[in-house]
Amino acid sequence: MSHSTEHNSRPEQSATLFIAASETDSNLYYATRFIAPDPFIYLEVKGERLMVMSDLEVDRARNQATVDRVLSYSELERRAKSQGVKDPGTIDVIHLVLQDAGLKDILVPPTFPFLHASRLQEMGYRLRTKRDPFYEQRVMKSDEEVRHIEAAQRATETAVAAAHQHLRRAEIRDNVLWLDGEILTSERVKKLIKIGRAHV
């Protein structure tokens, strides 16, 4: 990321910004407690934690995420258009939120998308990166988090053991595995594990 300086602490008058999928970004999941396979916008602005979500996900985010506010991407998009932006994109939407807060300094993770970073810098924003652990609190696990991790491990072990039982029951015919009259594919095994976890 060009022209960005690494800092280990957040300047007081800066925003934190993620554009990522929480399904693959553990820092973003930690911040929101919301699982999504597609990238979304997350901001920390003057002590307030915000998510900007598409119309498809906005209601689910409002019900499940542990943030202060969930904003509608399409509403911000319409607002940008009303201000003369012909075809608003992700950065135009972020710009509105940061403009409202009067902030120009942004703290981002090292994985922040380069093209988005370049666009923000072109608009006059100063970006700083911070290495992991982005949230120091993540290093310390609470008793509740430890219990959740242990429960997840037990569920996975039980589900995998159940899948092994299915494999032992399977028959080989013409070099193909069959179970209960159907071909036992790797996708079917994964599905059996997933179902097993859901019932633990």
Where are the language model's segments positioned?
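Flexible, acidic/His-enriched mid-domain "rim/lid" segments that flank
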Residues: 89-197
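N-terminal accessory/capping or targeting/presequence segment of soluble
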Residues: 2-102, 112, 147, 154
